Amino acid sequence: MIIVTGGFGMIGSNIVKALNEIGRKDILVVDNLKNGEKFVNLVDLDIADYCDKEDFIASIIAGDDFGEIDAVFHEGACSATTEWDGKYLMHNNYEYSKELLHFCLDHQIPFFYASSAATYGGRSDNFIEERKFEQPLNAYGYSKFLFDEYVRQVLPEADSPVCGFKYFNVYGPREQHKGSMASVAFHLNNQMLKGENPKLFEGSETFLRDFVYVEDVAKVNIWAWQNGISGIYNLGTGKAESFQAVAQAVIDFHGKGEIEKIPFPDHLKSRYQTFTQADLTKLRAAGYTGTFKTVAEGTKEYMAWLNR
């Protein structure tokens, strides 16, 4: 059996899809389905069972027997960078992750988890997987950073793979439940469907992000499991592209529209990453040779999926 936490979420459901594609359907999905809209992410996929997140944690603490587990993909967390309830974030993103990590270490189960480029904070270069380059700007980034630091402490003694991925700007299918936290491409497509022009913040031509297609993210996770990879790695394309490139790809798909600029919101000014670009040196050194879709390629594929 394979366990995917956050399996109804964007990245989790795409990992389930990637597992299905290699013939694995013996999947236990763990999630909090309070947001019932997320169920649509798995309706076309095959899983063996579902467990509520709180029940799952209780089972782990109680020492319940889950049978033979081949891997745990831990994608379940609060992913809202705008969430400032520190107690809530530390419970969901740190304490929960520690419980699951120790469960996997105790049973020698390969453990793959979601970290984030938010751990780097507002830097404009050297997105390198080392403590000296990490200075998160928000509580979400700090919760992810702290777990990375915890993993660094236990990695030298681990007898089974422990692998974290610092996800950069992930976009693509199965994110419609995320509301305001969904990708720019998703929101721009919705604006176009309403007959509006795609809207970007003023100055967005200077905002460069490493936009990585979610199916590429899932592929790297599967590769890491199949190859017994340990460590903490950046997961982006290695190339920063502009929000304008995203908007242009959406316009090109729809065959109409032009970019409209709107004022930059004051509440984001000191907490907004204006540049992200994954340094893939470590991932490539670990042996990953796969390619990553460009914004034009990924957005075109995503638009076709959204408008199918």
UniProtKB/Swiss-Prot annotation:
Organism: Actinobacillus pleuropneumoniae serotype 5b (strain L20)
TM annotation in the entry: none
Entry comment, domain topic: Contains a large N-terminal NADP-binding domain, and a smaller C-terminal substrate-binding domain.
Catalytic activity: ADP-D-glycero-beta-D-manno-heptose = ADP-L-glycero-beta-D-manno-heptose
GO molecular-function terms, A-Z: ADP-glyceromanno-heptose 6-epimerase activity; NADP binding
Binding annotation for NADP(+): 10-11, 31-32, 38, 53, 75-79, 92, 144, 170, 178
Domain of life: Bacteria
Known pathway: Nucleotide-sugar biosynthesis; ADP-L-glycero-beta-D-manno-heptose biosynthesis; ADP-L-glycero-beta-D-manno-heptose from D-glycero-beta-D-manno-heptose 7-phosphate: step 4/4
Protein name: ADP-L-glycero-D-manno-heptose-6-epimerase
Annotated positions binding substrate: 169, 180, 187, 201-204, 209, 272
Keywords attached to this entry: Carbohydrate metabolism, Isomerase, NADP
